[in-house]
């Protein structure tokens, strides 16, 4: 049996879990409306009153974090398309992907409307960057459906943390509320994806661990096609919104602990090797974090 066939067989084996996780999500998540949060009363016509930097009320670093997070959300069509690669329209996972896409769609609406009404971004640059980002496209390094769920479990947790931290750095109650709402949604989505991976681990630990080691070992946030991504990501890292240390301590290590990866037994040689790679990954990330922090202390972190 090919790896694709094995992966799809595993997906079919956890379909009942998927249904239960989706029902739990619908019961748990509180629906919200972005238009109730956005400060419309601050809005002014950009044609009559063009934007200028002194109108901004947030620091340049916080504005960078909010804009980068927004542009990452703008790539939603590509994230949705990843599900269509693996699942037919009648699959419960396609049903989930439509629900997830509908909920995710409000995130960009909320962040963009806040930034525009509060004049905390250059509207022309923001729109040009959105167009460039979407035209660039995004294709995740996911060969199988198992890869998809290992990636989304880590990515949704990482995105939750990035949104929450960006809001916490903002000297504005509305910005914090917007980002906290978005982060709460990401947490609900993370719980779903983590649950799918948990079910897969129960059914086939070897296949799931092999995929997990590959995905976590080469993990990238889905925003690398954004204009000036490296410079913006470094600014966010320096601000403490998201960096290697945060990725290690708030994403990788908690997930590996939750899944008890270090204590899984009865593995084949393939699973055992993947298990070893995952445990070693934490040491590798620690080294990367220490190097970044040393460079930051010496002010040698390049922005371009």
Where are these regions (language model features)?
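Non-heme di-metal
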Residues: 1-304
């Amino acid at each position: 049996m090919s790896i694709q066939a094995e992966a799809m067989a595993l997906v079919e084996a956890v379909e009942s879990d998927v249904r239960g996780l989706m029902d739990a999500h619908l019961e748990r998540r509180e629906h919200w409306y972005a238009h109730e949060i956005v400060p419309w009363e601050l809005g002014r016509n950009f044609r009559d009153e063009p934007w200028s930097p002194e109108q901004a009320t947030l620091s340049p670093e916080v504005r960078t974090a909010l804009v980068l997070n927004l542009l990452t959300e703008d790539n939603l069509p590509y994230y949705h398309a990843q599900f269509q690669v693996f699942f037919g329209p009648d699959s419960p996972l396609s049903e989930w992907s439509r629900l997830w896409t509908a909920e995710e769609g409000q995130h960009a609406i909320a962040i963009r409307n806040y930034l525009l009404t509060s004049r905390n971004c250059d509207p022309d640059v923001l729109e040009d960057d959105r167009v460039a980002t979407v035209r660039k496209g995004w294709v995740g390094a996911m060969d199988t459906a198992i890869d998809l769920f290992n990636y989304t479990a880590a990515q949704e947790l990482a995105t939750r943390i990035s949104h929450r931290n960006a809001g916490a750095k903002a000297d504005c109650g509305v910005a914090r509320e917007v980002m906290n709402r978005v982060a709460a949604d990401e947490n609900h989505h993370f719980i779903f994806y983590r649950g799918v991976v948990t079910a897969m681990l129960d059914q086939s630990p070897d296949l799931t661990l092999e995929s997990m080691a590959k995905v976590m070992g080469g993990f990238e946030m889905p925003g690398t096609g954004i204009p000036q991504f490296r410079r913006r990501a470094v600014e966010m890292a320096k601000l403490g919104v998201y960096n290697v240390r945060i990725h290690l301590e708030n994403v990788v290590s908690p997930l590996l602990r939750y899944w008890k990866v270090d204590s899984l037994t009865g593995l084949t040689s393939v699973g055992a090797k993947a298990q070893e790679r995952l445990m070693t990954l934490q040491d590798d990330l620690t080294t990367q974090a220490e190097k970044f922090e040393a460079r930051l202390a010496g002010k040698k972190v390049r922005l371009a």
